[in-house]
Swiss-Prot record:
Source organism per UniProt: Rhodopseudomonas palustris (strain BisA53)
NCBIfam families reported in the protein's UniProt record: argB
Record's signal peptide: none
Ligase is among the record's keywords: no
EC number, as in UniProt: 2.7.2.8
Transmembrane stretches, start-end: none
Gene assigned in the entry: argB
Site feature Transition state stabilizer, where: K34, K256
Keyword ATP-binding: yes
Reaction(s) catalysed by this chain's protein: N-acetyl-L-glutamate + ATP = N-acetyl-L-glutamyl 5-phosphate + ADP
Residues that hold substrate according to the record: G69, G70, R91, N196
GO cellular component, one term: cytoplasm
Name of the protein: Acetylglutamate kinase
Predominant localisation class: cytoplasm
Role according to the record: Catalyzes the ATP-dependent phosphorylation of N-acetyl-L-glutamate.
Amino acid sequence: MTDASHISPLEQARILSEALPHMQRYDEETIVIKYGGHAMGAEETAKAFARDIVLLEQTAINPVVVHGGGPQIATMLKRLGIKSEFAAGLRITDAATIEIVEMVLAGSINKQLVGYINEAGGKAVGLCGKDGNMVTACKATRTTVDPDSRIEEVIDLGFVGEPEKVDLTLLNQLIGHELIPVLAPLATSATGQTFNVNADTFAGAVAGALKAKRLLLLTDVPGVLDKSKQLIPELSVKDARRLIADGTISGGMIPKVETCIYALEQGVEGVVIIDGKTPHAVLLELFTNQGTGTLIHK
């Protein structure tokens, strides 16, 4: 992290001058920021993120934060002796697990982030997709092919959901009124069943419904990498699909990029995958000429 005391007044003025047109570009716009569990890191990292979110609100940007919590959920499940398994990149969530997931996401991480933002001078409101029926979900389905019979089989993921509908009534009461929504990726079914939703998918659905100017996915990697492990600074949807097809984009990056494509199709102007462990990653992306991470656009 740069020590500001070593930056000359002239350099500080240059940095502020460079930021001005970007601030004007995002004036009164909504930015959805997905803050991944792996990106949270130490307490000071989370507090620095919170200060940056407050800065966005102070510059007339409307930030909406969606947080994950995979590592924290895993830690709690292990502590309670509950075995956790994954399939197709998603945590299989049985009745016992969904209680822990809800407790960690909505009761612990969410309130911690709200506290950090409020401590930094903001007015954060902690919610999850269940509040006000904000996000309605259906049971997620995935399939696998049996290696011997070659027969396609359905994977039972338990209480894992995929967003079906986003009701903006509650969010619209907060956005633009100096309040910062902080959302845990939990949703409810039409019959009231709680679902655990992948945080990237949840953020993409919310950003799409809001027609956000930007969706930022903060993760633990620099962005999308080519086959030489070098950062790809910019991709069109067409290029992204090609890189998925040829295997350049693989593993856990595939669902992230698919979320980006979905959000763009729903009206989000641009989506950026960035390393949340980089100090002030959000500010670097929004307020500097070079940005950071990988920008995906139509």
